[in-house]
Amino acid sequence: MTWETVIGLEIHVQLNTKSKIFSGASTAFGAEPNAHASVVECALPGVLPVMNREVVEKAIKLGLALDAKINRKNVFDRKNYFYPDLPKGYQISQLDLPIVEHGKLEIVVGDDVKTINVTRAHMEEDAGKSVHEGLNGATGIDLNRAGTPLLEVVSEPELRSAAEAVAYAKALHSLVTWLDICDGNMAEGSFRVDANVSVRPKGQAEFGTRREIKNLNSFRFLEQAINYEAEAQIEILEDGSKVQQATMLFDPEKGETRVMRLKEDAQDYRYFPDPDLLPVIISDAQMQKAKAEMPELPKEMAARFVADYGVSEYDARLLTASRAQAAYFEEAAKASGQGKPTANWMNGELAAALNKAGLELADSPITAPRLAALVGKIADGTLSSKLAKKAFEAMWAEPESTIAEIIEKHGLQQMTDTGAVEAMVDEVLANNAKAVEQFKSGNEKALNAIVGQVMKASKGKANPAQVQELIKAKLA
């Protein structure tokens, strides 16, 4: 039997506000335990929550970017459950009236483009965390994270593989960082993924029983967890047993999922409207303000890069993976007047160098103006492609040097003396009679061998195109 995997993702996006969703306490990461726990998070008697306006504004921006319906009336609900890191005994969330509904997000997997529907995105507060390390067998409670504003973004169960799930998570991660509503730091818990996974026979319309894998904080873990869980469910079904609905944990060391608890449903949490919070009504002025503050979105910018700079759609997608990358490209392409070559250098040599050094683009020793200068020297014939790679390496190692200084210091300027190049061509032709005869007999590969010999003789400084033209003219 052929099985189909069905996946829906619930992604917790931590909003990058300075204060918490219902109090003025700081959201800064890394403080001493409970340093940022206010009386609201500690649930002291008589305290009341006060809504953070910025949370609503950031949620609206995500809704606009997802081309979603934005509900003007927002009601908060209490999600009731007991856990030590939740002193109130309930989490403030949204059940029936989420701020964002019916959005969509485009993903790319290989050569395929697919649109995934986004069911909803709702505002809620984060819980605290239990601390087990360094307490001699005891468990401590850290409420610094409690009350941190979240948007829980829920997809439709339209993802059909781990690769699609990772592509969706990466697309949403790129979007929320692009909008500057989340810092996207997965190691610090700013972007956490829960994956709902089920399997069914290929062609069956009815969904199988799903199991939810909680708190996946890397794209690699997301892929591994889904693949393992799908195989585990298939094995259960092929053995004649039934999959039990459950909440799962992923063990990255063993690369496997395990049951944390049997899955609860919404009725188990006994949701009801929070009586301490009035409905939040989004005004026309707030909507207009959010629309005015929206940046050019990645898809729109990618289309513009194709139209204005002549780059391929594939390159445009890479260049718009982040706002920093897009800004770098546009600055360099405008300065050099060479869109496609700039894209090639960014997605090729520069990306490889950054990856090897473990650096972000912002820390690159080759800034956008320096890359533009390099590309410009290739365009005006000063550097051949081979010499340009040597110049790039020197620029990386010598961040204070200009391209002109590097070319002079390392003797990288392409030969412009036609007579000298012609003399080298004549000498190579005289010494490679066999290759000459092969070319005259119609063997085009022989031409490449002759060009290679001339380039070797010139120490890479001759212009390959010029050399090829001279050879063809002499052997015509």
Curated annotation (Swiss-Prot):
<dbReference type="InterPro" id="IPR004413">
    <property type="entry name" value="GatB"/>
</dbReference>
<dbReference type="InterPro" id="IPR006075">
    <property type="entry name" value="Asn/Gln-tRNA_Trfase_suB/E_cat"/>
</dbReference>
<dbReference type="GO" id="GO:0005524">
    <property type="term" value="F:ATP binding"/>
</dbReference>
<dbReference type="InterPro" id="IPR014746">
    <property type="entry name" value="Gln_synth/guanido_kin_cat_dom"/>
</dbReference>
<protein>
    <recommendedName>
        <fullName>Aspartyl/glutamyl-tRNA(Asn/Gln) amidotransferase subunit B</fullName>
        <ecNumber>6.3.5.-</ecNumber>
    </recommendedName>
</protein>
<dbReference type="Pfam" id="PF02934">
    <property type="entry name" value="GatB_N"/>
</dbReference>
<dbReference type="Pfam" id="PF02637">
    <property type="entry name" value="GatB_Yqey"/>
</dbReference>
<dbReference type="InterPro" id="IPR003789">
    <property type="entry name" value="Asn/Gln_tRNA_amidoTrase-B-like"/>
</dbReference>
<comment type="subunit">
    <text>Heterotrimer of A, B and C subunits.</text>
</comment>
<comment type="function">
    <text>Allows the formation of correctly charged Asn-tRNA(Asn) or Gln-tRNA(Gln) through the transamidation of misacylated Asp-tRNA(Asn) or Glu-tRNA(Gln) in organisms which lack either or both of asparaginyl-tRNA or glutaminyl-tRNA synthetases. The reaction takes place in the presence of glutamine and ATP through an activated phospho-Asp-tRNA(Asn) or phospho-Glu-tRNA(Gln).</text>
</comment>
<keyword id="KW-0436">Ligase</keyword>
<comment type="similarity">
    <text>Belongs to the GatB/GatE family. GatB subfamily.</text>
</comment>
<keyword id="KW-0547">Nucleotide-binding</keyword>
<dbReference type="InterPro" id="IPR023168">
    <property type="entry name" value="GatB_Yqey_C_2"/>
</dbReference>
<dbReference type="GO" id="GO:0006412">
    <property type="term" value="P:translation"/>
</dbReference>
<keyword id="KW-0067">ATP-binding</keyword>
<keyword id="KW-0648">Protein biosynthesis</keyword>
<dbReference type="GO" id="GO:0050567">
    <property type="term" value="F:glutaminyl-tRNA synthase (glutamine-hydrolyzing) activity"/>
</dbReference>
<dbReference type="InterPro" id="IPR017959">
    <property type="entry name" value="Asn/Gln-tRNA_amidoTrfase_suB/E"/>
</dbReference>
<dbReference type="InterPro" id="IPR017958">
    <property type="entry name" value="Gln-tRNA_amidoTrfase_suB_CS"/>
</dbReference>
<dbReference type="GO" id="GO:0050566">
    <property type="term" value="F:asparaginyl-tRNA synthase (glutamine-hydrolyzing) activity"/>
</dbReference>
<dbReference type="InterPro" id="IPR018027">
    <property type="entry name" value="Asn/Gln_amidotransferase"/>
</dbReference>
<dbReference type="InterPro" id="IPR042114">
    <property type="entry name" value="GatB_C_1"/>
</dbReference>
<dbReference type="GO" id="GO:0070681">
    <property type="term" value="P:glutaminyl-tRNAGln biosynthesis via transamidation"/>
</dbReference>
